Amino acid sequence: MSNRRKNSLYPTLSAELSALMRTGWADTERHDLAPAEQAPYAALRRAALSARFPGERLVVPSGNLKVRSNDDTYPFRSYSGYVHMTGDQARDGALVLEPRPDGGHDAYCYQLPRDSRDDDEFWTGAHAELWTGRRRSLAESERVLGLPCRDVRTAAADLAAVSEVRTRIVRGIDPALEAAVTTDEERDAELEDALSDLRLVKDAWELGELRKAVDSTVRGFTDVVGELSRAVASSERWLEGTFFRRARLEGNAVGYGTICAAGEHATIMHWTDNDGPVRPGDLLLLDAGVETRSLYTADVTRTLPISGTFTPLQREVYDAVYEAQEAGIATVKPGAAYRDFHEAAQRHLAARLVEWGFIEGPAERAYELGLQRRFTMAGTGHMLGLDVHDCARARTEEYVEGVLEPGMCLTVEPGLYFQADDLTVPEEWRGIGVRIEDDLVVTEDGHENLSAGLPRSADEVEAWMARFAG
């Protein structure tokens, strides 16, 4: 046979080699696999989703590989709604909730099965197991997920064959599955909204994963402090790499693009180039989070004096942000409006900016007009979980306009950013950026700061750096 590949050093495949490759392989089926730790929690989440859409078929894909360049792909990351509902992270999968005539749904999962040794695909395919690693068999997946599993290669035909069932699918994740079903865009959006709604309150297992993520992140920040002196001779990249090493060692990776911003880069909200110099006397704003192997992420920010101590002006700005964060954190408790922490922090920053003469007062009027936003830029926090900006599609009345409940996890992250080219502030203020961010869980009687292991006040930061700086 001939199987020509452009510019391959092996442009042909002989029948003899093909026959040789198909024989002599051991049976590696694993019969010792137990259900995943999160499987019973995922079953409860599916039941909650089922209750929202009686009589309708629901399709939640995991997603496909995305090309980085040529034949190189990005590391795969499953759609968070799929992970939440299944505990699975495999590519090319899909959860289907099939409505039962008597109510409720039957759940099953489409998976990409193992490559057969009866043809050449297992070693010649673009993503063949012999090249990229062993996948789980369908039987293995059933044992791990606690769900019936089917071959995803028949999914499009299966779904298209039962076209009379009213169906919703999460759009933009798997084009082939999306093309196989006839759905309504507005109704599909409601499914995605519901998947976000159901992540607003974390269960006990999720909170445990978030604690792991934050604890690893605390260790990663300590690693960075120990490498500051080396980074002065290199760049922000050295510190980004230092944190990434911890993330890979203890978790899956980083949960989002690390912001490692020294000097005036600290005034750029989402600086991820991380290629600038690290200079003594400047501040380093590090916004980073470890993502666990279950894909839950931390999101923590500290602003550090590279020399180990704040200058008087740096400390003045830092203290203003710290006090604003304290005001925001104090509001986090069950029954409080979600917006309370944001409003408390922003009111404090507006008052300080009026006091400094950078915006026109009185402070309450400045806040009501949003004048502080020239220097605060973003909102003061967000939900946290499988995504760094978790529950982004949740209904507004349940999220931003909702009230806090035990089990919710959110960040509180006020900041002040005086751009290097901002002529409305004195020259010595320009290029100073400060943000402090912590991860909080709402408890029955208040809140728990998961990231309390990292110092926050200026004095605490300086003492911590003196202890760990290399």
Swiss-Prot record:
InterPro entries: Aminopep_P_N, Creatin/AminoP/Spt16_N, Creatinase/aminopeptidase-like, Pept_M24, Peptidase_M24B_aminopep-P_CS, X-Pro_dipept-like. It is an enzyme of class 3 (hydrolase). Its cofactor is Mn(2+). Mn(2+) 2 binds at residues 287, 299, 437. GO terms for biological process: proteolysis. One of its GO terms (molecular function) is manganese ion binding. Homodimer. Belongs to the peptidase M24B family. This is Xaa-Pro aminopeptidase 2. It comes from Streptomyces coelicolor (strain ATCC BAA-471 / A3(2) / M145). The gene is pepP2.
